[in-house]
Design a protein with these regions (language model features):
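Generic secondary-structure signature for well-ordered alpha-helical cores
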Residues: 28, 32-35, 58, 65, ...
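Short, charged, surface-exposed secondary-structure boundary motifs
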Residues: 21-24, 69-71, 119-122
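Conserved S-adenosyl-L-methionine
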Residues: 3-9, 104-108
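Rossmann-like adenosine-cofactor binding region
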Residues: 36-109
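NAD(P)-binding Rossmann-fold cofactor-contacting core
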Residues: 6-34
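Active-site-proximal catalytic alpha-helix in oxidoreductases
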Residues: 1-3, 59-62, 116-125
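Adenosine-phosphate binding glycine-rich loop
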Residues: 89-144
């Protein structure tokens, strides 16, 4: 089973034209796991951005925007609505500008700490053949 099983459609909004081919490569890899319809658009296409967000249940920032060396937020308040779930894969800082904005708009939010730790757990399993104590790590480092 795939994490995207049951998802009707995914819109990927690419912020840099130089990575357009990488976007298509990602779509090809995702199709190996799911029959989900996946489309690639330019983030700079504001009309498409608005249309995509209007139909979305989940928004995920998978860029480096939000880290200390690339601060900021790619979305504006007028694009968000309270029923959206907004996830930011940036884990430092925990409360990125996107997370702050989404909370102020009434959205449910997911910060990057969980995905960061889960990625580390997968790496530990693959490389070292052991299970990382995810709950302990989350409690120790993130107070969760």
């Amino acid at each position: 089973a795939s994490i995207i099983d049951g998802v009707a459609e995914i819109d990927v909004l690419n912020r840099q034209e130089a990575y357009q081919q990488s976007g298509y490569d990602l779509i090809d890899r995702l199709h190996a796991y799911s029959e989900c319809a996946i489309s690639l658009y330019a983030l700079s296409d504001e009309e498409q951005l608005r249309a995509s967000l209007a139909e979305s249940a989940l928004v995920v920032n998978a860029t480096n925007v939000g880290y200390p060396d690339d601060p900021g937020c790619l979305l504006t308040a007028d694009l968000l609505r309270p029923e959206l779930i907004v996830a930011d894969l940036v884990y430092n800082p925990r409360e990125t500008e996107l997370i702050k904005l989404a909370r102020s708009c009434g959205c449910k939010t997911v910060d990057g700490a969980g995905p960061f730790v889960q990625q580390a757990a997968i790496a530990e399993r693959l490389w070292l053949g052991r299970e990382m104590p995810v709950d302990f790590v989350m409690e120790t480092f993130f107070g969760e």
